[in-house]
Amino acid sequence: VNRPELSEKTIQAICSGAPAAAKKFIATIAEQAKREGVIVAIDGYTTANWTVFINLLAREITILGLEWETIDSNKSTLKDGKEIDAMIDPLLIWDTKIDPTLLYGKIYKGGYKGLLDEEKVGIFRKTVPAAKAPGKVVIVYGYGCLIPELRDIYDVKCFFDLTPKTSMLRIRRGEYSNLGKERPDAINRVIRRCYYCDFENAVHNRKELWKNNVPDWYFIDSDPGKLQMMPFATFADICAQLVKYPFRTKPCYLEGVWGGTYMKKLRNLPKEMRNAAWVFDFIPMEVSVLVKAGEELLDINYCSFVHKEGVNLMGEDCVKKYQGYFPIRFNWDDSYHSTGNMSIQCHSGGKFNIENYNEFGRQDESYYVVVTGHEAKTFIGFRDDADIPAFFKEIEAADTEHKPCDYMKYVSYEESVPGLQVMLPAGTIHSSGRNQVILEIGSLTIGSYTYKMYDYLRLDFDGKQRPIHTHLGELNVRQDRRTSVIHDPQSPEYIVQKPRLDASGDGWEEYILGENPQMYISLRRLEFENRCEQDTKGEKFHVLTLVDGEKVRVRSVEHPERHFDMDFMEIVCVPADMGRYVIENLGKEPIRIHKTCLRDGYQNDPA
């Protein structure tokens, strides 16, 4: 939980509970409603649920002896479902030979504006103002109703926000229908369309609203039983205070067939969880940030915070380069005491991702080994003697004829030890082997372009054969990344590097573990006994992970009260604007901290 210092005014402005929020909201507009009428607009992030709040508003309005009317902006302004399908479906891959699970598609870039029916909008812009009258409240609701083309007709503007986890859970419960749909489709289809259209529209809409400070009221809809409401200025102040501190995001945990038990035990996860294969500690599009505000605990969508405080958080150059998105993602892959390896896989490069998915660029990753058991291995690159055409034939046979592939003949590996760092630029064949926990650090993509090339003929939890992406894998895998090449300091494919000292001070040393011109991140390790001094210089954020030791405090030099205490295997972000900061050992063991930042010259990095 993050505990920035907030003013009493900010704390008192937060209203908790839908009934109390409705009562307070109506009190702020009652006089205007009596005198001339009020048009209220309620927009929100994908799956936002404003139904209960609107019903409570209607009750409060009736108690005051006023009239009310509700208008669904999506039904009133969007093209019909068939027209929207005709726009979005061609962007999605429907060939199961290419994409067996129908995961992929192209990002729709038209926004809510591109889905509008111009004739309907013309009528809407006349009928909504015409409905306004003294003694009446008109409530307009719908995704995208606050876009520039519509917003000037409203008097009061609201935005319902929620965490990505909450949004995904609502989708999986069948509570959401894609834009233009009357009812929910199959869950996987709803999710794919959200990734390539609905989420994308919502994120860009919210980003523009934040930039121009459009909303009057901000709502947190993550807990249906505890709606939280505050003036948008209050939300902005909370973000402005939080970015002055080192902070941690709220993790998400996912099970997987190759998942292990280490993180489940370390973090006291529920016994009914089979495992925790993936721990999304700091994946920007998936996490939220918990903020303590008086007695209230606010669970804020991380991207909402990023888009409000982007420059202070990431630095101006980073905001420009990555269009306001946080450009690095962090998660744990846990195969400790598991049933097997992660799949043999690769990811696609920039040209492929841009042309086929409308993405930002390539999907790079890296692995840092933190915990190992017996015989743990990290697979990376092809062996020098690998017959790659033969490998392709074997994985094809595994996929179509269910014949096992002798992958050890083809794929190179490192003996895993704590502290091993490998870089995985797009196209590198790789896998995290059984019996280890790795810190995975990757580049910015909206989707996840993981092409499983071999998965040991393994069944998923549903008892079905896990799908293989041999076609996409063969198109993208880099055949030149072989054992000798990836270890050669003279090679541009030098991605298994030896640590080299980069900086030192009183009792501390900083090593570069991995830097390569093909990747825009710099992977480092801080080593010290007592304390270590660092400086963001107001230019780059730092992401710190305690990979050895008990507990440390990360604090500002100029403002020591601005600090965060992090435990073993926690991940903390130090905002670019912090400047000089100190990491202090609060335990007795020597400290090792993994540090990630943007590589010098990242501004000129190609896609």
Regions found by a protein language model. Give the residues of each.
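Ligand-binding loop in jelly-roll beta-barrel domains
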Residues: S335-N341, G349, T372-E375, T428-G447, ...
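NTP-dependent small-molecule kinase module
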Residues: V1-R35, V52-G65, K165, R172-S177, ...
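Short acidic-glycine-tyrosine-enriched beta hairpin
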Residues: Y410-M423, R555-R580
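Transition-metal
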Residues: N212-P389, D455-K498, L523-R525
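ATP-dependent NMP and nucleoside kinases share a basic, alpha-helical "lid"
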Residues: F124-G180
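ATP-dependent small-molecule kinase phosphotransfer cores
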Residues: N2-A21, L66-V137
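Double-stranded beta-helix
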Residues: Y176, F379-D406, L439-S484, G587-A607
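Glycine-rich phosphate-binding P-loop
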Residues: V40-A58
